[in-house]
Amino acid sequence: MEAFAAESGGMPQLNPEFWVSQIFWLIITFGILYVVLSKLILPKISANLENRKSQILENIEAAEKQREESEQKIEEYEKIVQSSKNEAKNYFKQAREKVLKDIGVKREILEKELDEEVNKAEIEIKTFRDNAPEKIKKIAVETSSDLLQELIGAEVNSSSISAIVEDLSRKKMDEYYGN
């Protein structure tokens, strides 16, 4: 065979006398390859692709469900937060109103007490003012009597001292009160 290939001088694959056997074996090889691919490998690949496709679709559906659930949870959370804010505002408003009401009540009580104290003080001042001249006159008469008794050494008539003090105090009262 070596001699034949060397004599013919070329590649044996391109020799036309071997083409029939080459085509035969080529058809058998590709036929077997086709059968193996179509019956064994391609169904496995196709099944694998279908599994992947179904898994992807399931994952997409699960993701959609989770997205919807998360949106629903977010809406519930926002409702809860909003209701909590409203509740807090109501509590704050009620507390504020209560405090303002308590302050108002205490202010009224305090104003009444202050008015009562002012009225008492005015009454005391008026009473003192009304009684003060009499007491001052009495003290002035006693003091003047004692002083004159010390100076003169004799008993002094208290009615004359009283008349003098009365006259002087009337003049001072007229000056003071503008009568």
Curated annotation (Swiss-Prot):
It comes from the Bacteria. GO terms for cellular component: plasma membrane; proton-transporting ATP synthase complex. The chain crosses the membrane at residues 23-43. GO terms for molecular function: proton-transporting ATP synthase activity, rotational mechanism; proton-transporting ATPase activity, rotational mechanism. It holds the Pfam family ATP-synt_B. It is found in: Cell inner membrane. The keyword tRNA processing does not apply. Keywords: ATP synthesis, Cell inner membrane, Cell membrane, CF(0), Hydrogen ion transport, Ion transport, Membrane, Transmembrane, Transmembrane helix, Transport. PANTHER family: ATP SYNTHASE SUBUNIT B, ATP SYNTHASE SUBUNIT B', CHLOROPLASTIC. F-type ATPases have 2 components, F(1) - the catalytic core - and F(0) - the membrane proton channel. F(1) has five subunits: alpha(3), beta(3), gamma(1), delta(1), epsilon(1). F(0) has three main subunits: a(1), b(2) and c(10-14). The alpha and beta chains form an alternating ring which encloses part of the gamma chain. F(1) is attached to F(0) by a central stalk formed by the gamma and epsilon chains, while a peripheral stalk is formed by the delta and b chains. Belongs to the ATPase B chain family. This is ATP synthase subunit b.
